[in-house]
């Protein structure tokens, strides 16, 4: 049977740490990384070097990348072989500790992540040319600037009051996550025991052999001091400073606010003003071009539609500058028609009112003298007796309606 050759995404040499009878030992493998195709899954194959293959001691391991949970760098505490750097590959079944040449470790991690997590693809020239999809680059402004800051360190717990309360003893993996400091370990691989959000850490420090921090009361572990024995206290300290600095400089996520295009309008609509909602003295005086509230154009005028005092007050204010003397005393409309004889003539006005303001009266029409009155007025050549007689005041009839008017009028 002829086996069809699949295109390899990446190949080279990797070291795998294996558990043996007398401890752990690094073993060198030829590694080949395959991508997903129509008849195969994405996987990492580890085969023995050609020397052992010729002796019949070949060993082949296959890691299915669809079961991969995480890929991360490991500090130098893993004591990897010379000129190599370690990284972990965790799946649902077990945790692999691998080592690649120091110059190639980041390339291996990036290639594995591209195949294991296809939703988080980064621009890879070799992979994009084979797949035929357009080359994509990651936007550094899109909340992924802390991806490269996540690192893991092997630490050993020092007994403190807080660690005893949390029942932490032995060796663990301390990871500087995106938003919290995480502690991984336990009987099952890939178990996160505790996390301490950066905003809840009161203080942290390090020396040559120790890294420590003080957790606040809002942390899941409660407040207290935690100390870890490690040779990489300075690296953990610097990584923690970087992540905190990135979070401080990050812009807050939220919907963009729309720029204001004009003055804000009140949300409550104004209520229609009623002529009885305020006292009469506080109402504004109507202008000549303004309709009185409650009146509609073309509507029949009612007898009590407009108060008389309001109209009179408005007219006095409008024509105050036109009148030469004080305004005439207007009679009270409630009492100006008492004991009025419809047939008797009304008294003449002392002052002329502006045109169009005064009401129509009977004396607006011209009248001719009646009877022989014109003869008496034309007699001008009479004697002194006649002049004296004409200038005298005739007797006033006793039953006249205007006696009260003559009596009320004072001397000028």
Swiss-Prot record:
Domain of life: Eukaryota
PTM summary: On immunoreceptor stimulation, phosphorylated on C-terminal tyrosine residues. Phosphorylation on Tyr-351 is required for binding to the SH2 domain of NCK. Phosphorylation on both Tyr-276 and Tyr-304 is required for interaction with RASGAP. Phosphorylated on tyrosine residues by TEK/TIE2.
Residue ranges occupied by any PH domain in the UniProt entry: 7-117
This protein's UniProt keywords: Phosphoprotein
Pfam families named in the record: IRS, PH
Stretches for region Disordered: 250-304, 322-349, 366-412
GO MF annotations in UniProt: transmembrane receptor protein tyrosine kinase adaptor activity
Result after altering residue 304 to F: No loss of binding to SH2 domain of RASGAP. Complete loss of binding to SH2 domain of RASGAP
Annotated IRS-type PTB domain residues: 149-254
Tagged with keyword Transmembrane helix: no
Gene Ontology process terms (BP): cell surface receptor protein tyrosine kinase signaling pathway; negative regulation of MAPK cascade; Ras protein signal transduction
InterPro entries: Docking_Protein_DOK, Dok1/2/3_PTB, IRS_PTB, PH-like_dom_sf, PH_domain
Positions of post-translational Phosphotyrosine modification: 276, 304, 351
Effect upon mutating residue 276 to F: No loss of binding to SH2 domain of RASGAP or NCK. Complete loss of binding to SH2 domain of RASGAP
Tissue expr: Highly expressed in spleen and lung.
Recorded domain comment: PTB domain mediates receptor interaction.
Subunit composition and interactions: Interacts with phosphorylated RASGAP and EGFR. Interacts with RET and NCK. Interacts (via PH domain) with TEK/TIE2 (tyrosine phosphorylated).
Stored PANTHER family: DOCKING PROTEIN 2, DOCKING PROTEIN RELATED
Family from the record: Belongs to the DOK family. Type A subfamily.
Protein name, entry field: Docking protein 2
Organism from which the protein derives: Mus musculus
């Amino acid at each position: 049977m002829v086996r069809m050759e699949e295109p390899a995404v990446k190949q080279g040499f990797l070291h795998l740490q294996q558990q043996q009878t007398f401890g752990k030992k690094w073993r060198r493998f030829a590694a080949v990384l395959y991508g997903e195709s129509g008849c195969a899954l994405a996987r990492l194959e580890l085969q023995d070097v050609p020397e052992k293959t010729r002796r019949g001691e070949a060993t082949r391991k296959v890691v299915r990348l669809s079961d991969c949970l995480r890929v991360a760098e490991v500090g130098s505490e893993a004591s990897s072989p010379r000129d190599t750097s370690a990284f972990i590959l965790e799946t649902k079944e077990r945790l692999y500790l691998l080592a690649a040449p120091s110059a190639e470790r980041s390339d291996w991690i990036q290639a594995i992540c591209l195949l294991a997590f296809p939703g988080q693809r980064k621009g890879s020239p070799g992979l994009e040319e084979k797949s035929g999809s357009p080359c994509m680059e990651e936007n550094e402004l899109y909340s992924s600037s802390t991806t490269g800051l996540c690192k893991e360190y092997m630490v050993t717990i020092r007994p403190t009051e807080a660690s005893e309360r949390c029942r932490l003893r032995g060796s663990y993996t301390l990871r500087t996550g995106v938003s919290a400091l995480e502690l991984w370990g336990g009987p099952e691989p890939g178990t996160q025991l505790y996390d301490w959000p950066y905003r809840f850490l009161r203080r942290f420090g390090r020396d040559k052999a120790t890294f420590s921090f003080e957790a606040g009361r809002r942390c899941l572990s409660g407040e207290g001091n935690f100390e870890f024995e490690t040779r990489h206290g300075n690296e953990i300290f610097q990584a923690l400073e970087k992540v905190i600095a990135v979070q401080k400089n990050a812009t807050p996520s939220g919907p963009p606010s729309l720029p204001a295009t004009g003055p804000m309008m009140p949300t409550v609509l104004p209520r229609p003003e009623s002529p009885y909602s305020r006292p009469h003295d506080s109402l504004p005086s109507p202008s000549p071009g303004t309709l009185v509230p409650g009146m509609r154009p073309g509507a029949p005028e009612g007898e009590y539609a407009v108060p008389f005092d309001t109209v009179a007050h408005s007219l006095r204010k409008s024509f105050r500058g036109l009148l030469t003397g004080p305004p005439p005393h207007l009679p009270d409309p409630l009492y100006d028609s008492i004991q009025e004889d419809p047939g008797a003539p009304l008294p003449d006005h002392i002052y002329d009112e502006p045109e169009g303001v005064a009401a129509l009266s009977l004396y607006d029409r011209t009248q001719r003298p009646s009877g022989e009155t014109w003869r008496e007025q034309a007699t001008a050549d009479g004697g002194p007796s006649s002049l004296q007689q004409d200038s005298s005041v005739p007797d006033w009839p006793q039953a006249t309606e205007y006696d009260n008017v003559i009596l009320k009028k004072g001397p000028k």
